[in-house]
Amino acid sequence: MRRLVFPLLVLAAAALAASAFAATRTSDPVVKWKTAQFGSILATKGHLALYTWNQEKVRKVKCTGACAKVWPPITIPHGTMAPKHIAGVMGTFGEVMRPDGKTQLTFNGHPLYTYHGDTPTKILCNGVDGWYVVKVH
């Protein structure tokens, strides 16, 4: 019996340490939102449309500095993991590290942004300079 106690204590301590350092899953940072203008799109929980930029390659961030002020990136807190899937959305979510060290949410590998001039009732920049609303099924 004594021989089992020490290995079990070591195993329990290792499991506890691993759980302390594991990243936690963030709550779904985006939602599927039905609009009259575009149909179903990805949006923030506050119903701001999400965009991708055709100047960026998969998992490569190019919009920084002044660009990121106009097109704020969707970031997730340090130490959390993006959900891989969101109910009702076909596609895969992931993460990319931005040059400033923040973690940005991606959809099918493409970094996600909002537009600073949009409101929940106005989606202003679909198709402007290579920025497109993320339409989903």
Predicted regions and their residues:
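Bacterial N-terminal signal peptides
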Residues: P7-L16
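N-terminal targeting/docking segments
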Residues: M1-R2, L16
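Compact beta-sheet-dominated domain cores in extracellular/mature segments
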Residues: R3-L4, F21-H137
